Curated annotation (Swiss-Prot):
Protein name, UniProt field: Large ribosomal subunit protein uL24
Origin: domain of life: Bacteria
Family of this protein: Belongs to the universal ribosomal protein uL24 family.
Keyword Ribosomal protein belongs to the record: yes
Organism: Burkholderia multivorans (strain ATCC 17616 / 249)
Function: One of two assembly initiator proteins, it binds directly to the 5'-end of the 23S rRNA, where it nucleates assembly of the 50S subunit. One of the proteins that surrounds the polypeptide exit tunnel on the outside of the subunit.
Amino acid sequence: MNKIRKGDEVIVIAGKDKGKRGVVLAVAADRVTVEGINLVKKHVKPNPMKGTTGGVEAKTMPLHISNVAVVDANGKASRVGIKVEEGKKVRFLKTTGAVLSA
């Protein structure tokens, strides 16, 4: 069970975007893509077959999962734990003890 999932609101706790918040767009094995965070400029060649024009595009790149933390109700970074409730594993915030949605 992943501790961080798509749709979670997270805060960056390390790196060039430290302190910024965003919503998780995708989760890979050990990396997360966060909306509007870790933007890089990529040069794109024009391709008439795809109908794209050339130029420089800003693209969101993945961050390592250890560099982000879930935001709790108070707006602070929180670690996520896993516990068993009624025979099912659920994620909970270590700071407040609140259970995260499935």
